[in-house]
Amino acid sequence: MGDTVVEPAPLKPTSEPTSGPPGNNGGSLLSVITEGVGELSVIDPEVAQKACQDVLEKVKLLHGGVAVSSRGAPLELVNGDGVDSEIRCLDDPPAQIREEEDEMGASVASGTAKGARRRRQNNSAKQSWLLRLFESKLFDISMAISYLYNSKEPGVQAYIGNRLFCFRNEDVDFYLPQLLNMYIHMDEDVGDAIKPYIVYRCRQSINFSLQCALLLGAYSSDMHISTQRHSRGTKLRKLILSDELKPAHRKRELPSLSPAPDTGLSPSKRTHQRSKSDATASISLSSNLKRTASNPKVENEDEELSSSTESIDNSFSSPVRLAPEREFIKSLMAIGKRLATLPTKEQKTQRLISELSLLNHKLPARVWLPTAGFDHHVVRVPHTQAVVLNSKDKAPYLIYVEVLECENFDTTSVPARIPENRIRSTRSVENLPECGITHEQRAGSFSTVPNYDNDDEAWSVDDIGELQVELPEVHTNSCDNISQFSVDSITSQESKEPVFIAAGDIRRRLSEQLAHTPTAFKRDPEDPSAVALKEPWQEKVRRIREGSPYGHLPNWRLLSVIVKCGDDLRQELLAFQVLKQLQSIWEQERVPLWIKPYKILVISADSGMIEPVVNAVSIHQVKKQSQLSLLDYFLQEHGSYTTEAFLSAQRNFVQSCAGYCLVCYLLQVKDRHNGNILLDAEGHIIHIDFGFILSSSPRNLGFETSAFKLTTEFVDVMGGLDGDMFNYYKMLMLQGLIAARKHMDKVVQIVEIMQQGSQLPCFHGSSTIRNLKERFHMSMTEEQLQLLVEQMVDGSMRSITTKLYDGFQYLTNGIM
């Protein structure tokens, strides 16, 4: 949020090297480089060092930095601690490459003068090729990450670290887990190359700062505790959590908090004065954190926050800018841990609604939902809409979050709180003149609402402690009130003049609506999420907006998030990256496969947040609620075989099934029961829960031995074994595999970099990466690949282990 793209310097024409044949313009040399992208071993280390040293000399002249060291690495390339230093893209061509006259004495002594001249010529050519690759349009972020990981030369690493400033923020953000994992677990030169970019971006974006702090903590957790405490990752995390990286404009605003005369204060100034006077109480935030800490890791985090907060002047400084958001996240996690201690789903649901009702007392505040893609402030959580999701041992839950979109999170004021009892007046504005209230009176009534939350102190830990209190009856009255307000808003919008509609038109419209309206699920106390997930998203947004005191505001938005405690989402994040990369590859190669990667926020090694898939329910819920086969459910939802709606849903099913079958094969995704496969309103299937991938399986049983899950019910929806859509499915599988193996390196490097220093179960065993590469079948012809696809499809359909695992899940967890 609030990311600012670093504008690269305009590209200058690059002088072509003269080492290629006449008239070739060096094209053959460039083709040689592009054929071996990532194979850094073919480049002489001394040549790479010399080439990059020349570029870095130019950087030194541009930035006025410290001279380049003898190893080729800059001692101070980009001053990450400087706020106003200009960051420029290093696309300018370097100076003419110097001959290595001073360094060649030993080489000449060991060989003939002719051999030395030939070696110098070859080195110059290799130097030119490498630099031309780095400056070409082919050099994208994926290639930069590959060279940063594979290179052993500090000069190359430092050059690429500076090239990170040239790429779009969103492109680099995709590889943030890889960058931070390299920073933590690889040598110092890699860390020195990465840090300036991380520090610069943290100054620009509070959301980027939060992401870095969370990932650094999660990926450092696999280290030994004594090593972890003094590691570079821990030090960088402490720097981010302190106030050192606060944007300059926020630091300059602090003197404005000095006391002002009481006379003639405007309402806004009076509010500001109040927040300053309460700053002393709010600054003690860190000392109260330990009341809600539930494990030693959280306590350690709190100690770090406390130490950084004590140095702040209580009179003039607000708390660390990330402190309110961290408290908001910790309170959501604490709710999940408390829910897990309750025995029944109904008790968990009641407790969840009560806890969220108390949480609303501290909103609006300077907090946001990190899974969203735009700047906003959280203003309200409609607590009666929250549901507990299916889980045997834990208590993941789904909440909906009302936010107000803003241009810049850091500079926009926190919205004023609107009490719940003002819903009627805000939603029935057009009726107010009839009640004798003028427009001026109405405007005046809203302007007198004090903005008590327009500061960083809006989130107080003292009130979070109150969440320990159970209020089982809170949700009942709130639900009734919201229902009443919804009715009032509907009646208030009724037209004043009668409208006459023919009875035949009414019957026709009702019949059309019934034909296209999806069926609703019945409320099940053991599965309360089914009804909530089945409701169409747009209908849910309309309903919640009508019941919200903020719903009348034009920048009101509704978000949703799944909160998970006790689960390590680092594997989920890895799977998300692979799915996102495959999705990009198939789009680039124009293969109409469909998959739905959903965002993952890793909070710690055992907690996180997940972006829900809207308008989708699990196949288990479909079968349990409808008591129909998958094909019959399709017919019920989308119409008969020949309708356009059914044919469109069938095509969507085939394209998504083929896409996820390839994903499951390449990543070896396990635990594929019907509770982990969703079906959306358009007919797509979406696989969720990637907790068992690559080298791991549930309880290490190795139950699922087939390449992917393809049941007879899936084939029936496709039209049977002899249907055209089933042949289309196999053709898509072949096209998708051919396209994926063309870009194998982009997929493999995502996984390979994350294996560094990791103790995740998916990396157990020494052959994880080798087996992943083998599943791309680089040596096979297309005819052999076609035969392979036929064999995998046939084997998956006939797999006895798939049937056994589905039966096992039904007996142990009741999953149909």
Swiss-Prot record:
Reaction catalysis annotation: a 1,2-diacyl-sn-glycero-3-phospho-(1D-myo-inositol) + ATP = a 1,2-diacyl-sn-glycero-3-phospho-(1D-myo-inositol 4-phosphate) + ADP + H(+)
Annotated function: Phosphorylates phosphatidylinositol (PI) in the first committed step in the production of the second messenger inositol-1,4,5,-trisphosphate (PIP). May regulate Golgi disintegration/reorganization during mitosis, possibly via its phosphorylation. Involved in Golgi-to-plasma membrane trafficking.
Organism placement in taxonomy: Eukaryota, Metazoa, Chordata, Craniata, Vertebrata
Gene Ontology CC annotation, any one: rough endoplasmic reticulum membrane
PI3K/PI4K catalytic domain span: 535-801
Alphabetical UniProt keywords: Acetylation, ATP-binding, Endoplasmic reticulum, Golgi apparatus, Kinase, Lipid metabolism, Membrane, Mitochondrion, Mitochondrion outer membrane, Nucleotide-binding, Phosphoprotein, Transferase
N-acetylglycine PTM positions: 2
Organism: Callithrix jacchus (White-tufted-ear marmoset)
Polar residues composition bias: residue spans: 278-297, 306-318
Protein family per UniProt: Belongs to the PI3/PI4-kinase family. Type III PI4K subfamily.
Gene Ontology terms, MF aspect: 1-phosphatidylinositol 4-kinase activity; 14-3-3 protein binding; ATP binding
Gene3D superfamilies: Phosphatidylinositol 3-/4-kinase, catalytic domain (1.10.1070.11), Phosphatidylinositol 3-kinase Catalytic Subunit, Chain A, domain 4 (3.30.1010.10)
Gene Ontology BP, a term: phosphatidylinositol-mediated signaling
Region: Interaction with ACBD3, residue numbers: 2-68
InterPro entries named in the record: Kinase-like_dom_sf, PI3/4_kinase_cat_dom, PI3/4_kinase_cat_sf, PI3/4_kinase_CS, PI3K_accessory_dom, PI4KB-PIK1_PIK, PI_Kinase
Start and end residues of each PIK helical domain: 52-242
Name of the protein in its database record: Phosphatidylinositol 4-kinase beta
Region span, G-loop: 541-547
Assembly and binders: Interacts with ARF1 and ARF3 in the Golgi complex, but not with ARF4, ARF5 or ARF6. Interacts with NCS1/FREQ in a calcium-independent manner. Interacts with CALN1/CABP8 and CALN2/CABP7; in a calcium-dependent manner; this interaction competes with NCS1/FREQ binding. Interacts with ACBD3. Interacts with ARMH3, YWHAB, YWHAE, YWHAG, YWHAH, YWHAQ, YWHAZ and SFN. Interacts with GGA2 (via VHS domain); the interaction is important for PI4KB location at the Golgi apparatus membrane. Interacts with ATG9A.
